Design a protein with these regions (language model features):
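Short active-site neighborhood of thiol/selenol oxidoreductases, capturing the structured segment around
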Residues: 50-73, 93
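Structural microenvironment flanking redox-active thiols in thiol-disulfide oxidoreductases
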Residues: 73-117, 127-134
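Bacterial N-terminal signal peptides
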Residues: 9-18
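Bacterial N-terminal signal peptides that target proteins for export
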Residues: 1-9
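Structural micro-motif
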Residues: 118-122, 136-144
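N-terminal "domain-start" segment that seeds a small globular fold
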Residues: 23-52
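Thiol-/selenol-based redox modules, centered on thioredoxin-like
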Residues: 145-188
Length: 188
């Protein structure tokens, strides 16, 4: 076997198995199947404590963010729009604030950020990052869409519309699709 073959063989195997990224990837960071329970939440803002079990039967949009992340701030308008658009539907928007730095553990600062940017949806303060770890999250911001059975069906890493990407539109279509899917099956 030549040196060239040693390098080529693993790449060929990956191609055969469909492993790797392609230009058609639509940003699906799914590392889990079932949505984990909210665990170790330091405090809930804008809501009483929520559980994934109690949210079964609803489409749940979970987004991870932190105060010091400008990409997270750029996503706020989309979260607010979804909150308004789906207010009369079985959709729940939940923010999970998982800090990156020591200063981001400050609950008063998180509340101030939520008030300043009119974030009215439930926010779980994840100061111990137990939810971050349970969801196997990697970057801020990340958005997950969970179906009515509690199965994570879609995920988007990073700013939704960064450099012309269509993340907001894609996530919205996933939400609409899940609402139509469950309505068509009569499982509202």
């Amino acid at each position: 076997m030549t040196r060239r073959s040693i390098y080529f063989l693993p790449l060929a195997l990956m191609a055969l198995l469909g492993v790797g990224a392609s230009a058609d990837d639509d940003n699906r960071p799914l590392r889990i199947r079932n949505a984990p329970e909210f665990d170790g939440v330091t405090r809930w803002i804008n809501s009483k404590p929520l559980t994934m079990k109690a949210l079964k039967g609803k489409v749940v949009v979970v987004h991870f963010w932190t105060n010091g992340c400008f990409n997270c701030v750029n996503n706020y308008e989309h979260y607010r729009a979804w909150q308004e658009r789906y207010a009369d539907k079985d959709v729940v928007i939940i923010g999970i604030h998982s800090p990156e730095t020591a200063s981001e553990h400050d609950i008063a600062r998180i509340e101030k950020q939520a008030e300043k940017h009119k974030l009215k949806f439930p926010i779980a303060v994840d100061n111990e990052t137990r939810n971050w770890e349970a969801w196997k999250n990697k970057v801020w911001p990340t958005v997950y869409v969970v179906d009515r059975r509690g199965v994570v069906r879609y995920g988007w890493e990073g700013e939704l519309n960064f450099k012309g990407q269509k993340g907001e539109e894609t996530v919205r279509k996933v939400i609409d699709s899940l609402l139509a899917e469950t309505t068509a099956k009569g499982t509202r």
